[in-house]
Every structure is written in structure tokens, then in C-alpha cells.
Amino acid sequence: MARIKDKYRNEVAPAMMEKFGYKSVMQIPRLEKIIINMGLGQAKENQKELEIAVKELGIIAGQKPITTKAKKSVANFKVREGMAVGAKTTLRGEKMYEFADRLINIALPRVRDFRGVNPNSFDGRGNYALGVKEQLIFPEIEYDKVDKVRGMDIILVTTANSDEESRELLRLLGMPFTK
């Protein structure tokens, strides 16, 4: 079992139950899924770029990502409908907890000049969005084999009803928020 899942069951859930006064164990917010998205503007000219990004995202997530396609044609960006413009993957279950553990305990502390993540990046429905500027913070990516630095969006979707509940859940799981 993932360390973070174990921590959730033994420490986080009882603390949340006490703080918010839930009547049922099922009311306690939990991680539902983690979505990792890589938007690649350069992919329209260079198909190899997309293949490399998909491969790297697969290594980071531990499962094969899908390529995202443009919904509309935009002349200013030279994008036509149906062109591949990025890659994304959705993690659930054990893989989600494993990834959350690696993100919080290994990847985020490796970010240059890291002082914590923004505590205001909640969407109003209890979900947290986080932008990463480079894929090198993940230990699975070998520095020598990287041709280009790519960023990604990581969205942590929770079952929380409010940002306050979600913030407390992530804080108890070990997410390093800035003060």
C-alpha cells in the first residue's frame, strides 16, 4: 500500500473528522484522481516532439498517456481542428497515491528556489491546480536523455465540497504550502 494512502487512513481521516465534525466516514474528503497535462505548442510542426513528450509523461505517470487534439481551428496559432497539441493522463487508485507521494516528497523539494506551493490555486470546488516548469524534478527522467525542458499541469481532484476542506486535506497529506 502507498505510504500516502496509509497516512490518509491512519492520520488524515481521523484529524479531518475531528476538525470538520463529519457524521459519516464517507463525508471525509479524499483524493479522487490526479490529471497530468502537457500542452505542446511546438507539436504541430514537429511530430517527434510529441512522441518524446508522450514517452516522458508515460515514464513520470507510470501509465500510457493519450494525445490531446485541438477542438477548433485557430488561424493565429496555425492550429487546425484535430491536430495533436498535447498529452494527458488521469491517475486513479494505487497509481494516484504513488504519484502523489512522489510529487510531495521527492519532486517538489527538487524544484529550484522552492518555498512551497501557492495556497490560492484552488478552483472553488475543492480541486487544486499546480504548474511545473520542468519535467526534470521527477527522478524517473534522466537528465542526460532530455532534449528539451517541458512543463506540465497537475490537477489534484478531491471529493471536498469547499476549498477550505481540500486545503486542509492536502496540508495533512504533506503538501508544502507557502505561509
From Swiss-Prot:
This is Large ribosomal subunit protein uL5. SUPFAM superfamilies: RL5-like. The keyword Glycoprotein does not apply. This is one of the proteins that bind and probably mediate the attachment of the 5S RNA into the large ribosomal subunit, where it forms part of the central protuberance. In the 70S ribosome it contacts protein S13 of the 30S subunit (bridge B1b), connecting the 2 subunits; this bridge is implicated in subunit movement. Contacts the P site tRNA; the 5S rRNA and some of its associated proteins might help stabilize positioning of ribosome-bound tRNAs. Keywords: Ribonucleoprotein, Ribosomal protein, RNA-binding, rRNA-binding, tRNA-binding. GO terms for molecular function: rRNA binding; structural constituent of ribosome; tRNA binding. The keyword Methyltransferase does not apply. It holds the Pfam family Ribosomal_L5_C. Belongs to the universal ribosomal protein uL5 family. The gene is rplE. GO terms for cellular component: ribonucleoprotein complex; ribosome.
